[in-house]
Amino acid sequence: MLASLCRAVAIIFSIVLLVSCGGGGGGQSSVPTAATPPAATPPTSQSPIDASLGTLLQRPVMQCGSSVDTLTADTAPNSLVVFESGPVRPLALSSDGQRLYVTNAPANCLEIYDIEGDTLRLVSTVSVGLEPVAVAERAANEVWVVNHLSDSVSVVRLDGTPRVLRTLQVGDEPRDIVFAGTSRDRAFISSANRGQNRPGFTSASLVTPGTGRADIWIYDAAQLDDSLNGKPLSVLTLPSDVPRALAISNDGRTVYAASFMSGNRTTVLHRDALNIPKPGISTSADGVQAPATGLIVRFDGTAWRDEVRNDWSSRVKFTLPDEDVFAIDATAATPTLGSRHSGVGTTLFNMAVNPADGRLFVTNTEALNEVRFEGSGQRGNTTVRGRIAESRVTVITPASGAVTPVHLNRHVNFALPQGASIPAAEKSKSLSQPTALVFSPNGETLYTAAFGSSKVAALPTSALVSGNYAPDSSRHIDVPAGPAGLAINASGNRLFVYSRIAHAVVVVDVANRSVLSTRNLFSPESAAVREGRRFLYDATLSSANGTVSCASCHVFGDLDHLAWDLGNPDERTELNPNAYLPLSPRTTIRFHPLKGPMTTQTLRGMRGNGPMHWRGDRTGTARAVVRGQTESLEEAAFKEFNGAFVGLLGRETPISPAQMQAFTDFAMQLAMPPNPVRALDNSLTTEEAAGRDLYMNFPITLLGSCDNCHRLRPNNGQFGTNGLMTFEGGRITENFKIPQLRNMYTKVGMFGFSADGGGVTGAQIRGFGFSHDGALDTLDNFFRDPVFLFPPPAAETRRQVTAFVLAFDSDLFPIVGQQVTWRPGASDVIESRLALLRTQAQTLTPRRVCDLVARATVNGTVFSALLQSDGSWAMRGGGLRSDAELRGLATVTQPLTFTCVPPGTGRRIALDQA
């Protein structure tokens, strides 16, 4: 009997591998991996299926990732886009503890491992959406996967042949999922309150004060329909910025939802709102008076105050409740919002509930952006050097509402002089960017992944609750770089850790705090991306005290939605060599080191944007020859940030030129996502179209149209900037590099301008808005500057240009990432969406929109196809099929899933071909 089963399984896998073109897989080793994982090795896919799996995985399949994919961006150039989506819940254990589900984000794949003692054996892989960041088990035969870039959730069935049964379209950039309710039959999914799949969304909501930007999609998992959205019970909007983490109470009756970048009750006053001089030093080291700039203030519970406690409350036109974590009644007929908790942290990563007492624990960082200046602090008396943000775990007691933040690095002497190092024994206690967390079964230990420290810390729960936590390196477990996902078995003796930088899963012996085995995952990323990633996150490398990194502000390569006053009073003015827009006045002859507040800019999409920083003070003039070619201006400019490792992060010395080159190679690959405000067919509404016409053609300034400065030439890679400097008008005293405009929709949420005569606007969800310092609350207020000459009626034309800018073109078209699952008898709305995907994929001018990939697993056989220009489908393994022939493969329970992937990536993804 067993021999017959083995032969049957071998035959199935032979068919699968023949159709799928074979390939590499996840290797097994006994030691932790380095930051760059070794080449993956083929899985032992022909070993017998464990009888204990019963009807599950009877026909394991290998669709993607560590099982069959072989090509990378090195062997198939230009076949990968690096989105740097942050993992949220990348691991899930099956309810019987026998399987581990792993999201392989760069491979767009769910990987299923059998737990065999202290090792992991790959038994199946299922192709899901783009950038899967979370997975949760709904039942023994079903898991749901959250696809961050596809704005979707893949419902994966495991009975018989693992396959995607449904694709649920949800809001923009979903991040987390849990199943709650007394029977755990309701799915809760966090996403941004925007996007073309969000019912009722229009760009008008982006200019409406007091509108929440966070959605929780709620489903009865047993009552899905075949519409695009799958018939959610409700979509609950939270009064916060976009959400990330979810957690459930021990009885399943409450779901906790956390805002991601929730802020910290800081805001910035416009320079025109300052009726007294700013406190502190106002000259450079060479004695030049600083330009007039704004001021960051923080609400202390009673008033808005600056660093010397001046009260600026009369200048702030709104309140910031700073609501971070929300409780949701998961059992109500229509789930409702309950208690809210403030003061949890600035950037909230993950949450877990203690199984012993029901307390909620939240990993977070607390930004210190109200502290002025970088550098030594000698002339300025203050500096954030080495202490940009505190890594914390915050304890919430639901019964009382008590919120107790616990700083994890209280052992560090942050007053050490610039260039000094702390003893190795002290540095080894540091933990940076805590993300995933999981409790021991008895609730006495909280295992916390320190993404920036390559460690998992076993924190005593009682010490966190009491606030008496004492850092102790003996409680740390060294793991591969970038730990971001944790799961623990029922007995509490084995911990499973997913590390994003190393792209590996390890099995940890909890008692000995040692790694027992390592499973390397396949990644299609280039060696340059894999090797350079650590320089963004690695706090041990980046800072002398091991607590901060570039990712402390540039969270997952993006931004933190805060402003910082990172001038350096110890420095002198420097000559501004940058090129200016023709006819623009040139008033900033020299860059002043006291630049004033500036909002964090994204690291995504930097190629082709010219000098860096808001002022362009990373000029890129010293361009080197690298690998036989003169580097780009942007590459040279990025390397000028090396000094920040010392002056800002607090490292003893800059990193080496080779390390900075590796960091640069990685950073230049980071990409912007599609704009979710734009219609999926890339069309414009009547208002957006009118705004585009004004933007491109009307002389809104004396220098010309908006496009004259903010150049929009998608075919040339220009999305709002031509890389030149310009005079900004009389209200701004410094000249600035013209910035790109692709992410304006992410900056909405502050209403109330400190420098106008308007009244108080009420509670808002964020304290920073538009312009270089975030002081302008809305684009409409930005366009009210006297430098702009809008045609009458000005209110209407400003509104039109605002609508267009919020729907601005991006590198990738709106359809990229979008999916639909089709089965015979599909509804009209499914057919319509599939027709849209096909039409967009066959649009080649003025530039290619996307590649359309089709995937199915039917009776144990994997089918993977790429749409051709003539409408036929190229099949993985060879041959062509007509559209009718491809659809003829699908059945009601074994459907086809179609995905629009970035142009140029389809051959690698669908066919494993360059």
Task: Give residue ranges: language-model regions.
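Beta-strand-rich domains and repeat architectures in extracellular enzymes and scaffolds
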Residues: 76-111, 320, 432-441
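Bacterial Sec-dependent N-terminal signal peptides
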Residues: 17-68
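Asp-box/WD-like beta-propeller blade repeats and closely related beta-sheet repeat scaffolds
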Residues: 162-181, 190-195, 200-215, 228-248, ...
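Blade-loop segments of beta-propeller domains
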Residues: 119-140, 148, 174-176
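A short helix->beta-strand "capping" segment at the edge of beta-propeller domains
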Residues: 53-88, 120, 231, 335-337, ...
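Periplasmic c-type cytochrome electron-transfer domains
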Residues: 163, 180, 248, 256-263, ...
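Short, conserved, GDST-rich strand-edge loop motifs in beta-rich repeat architectures
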Residues: 190-211, 258-319, 362-390
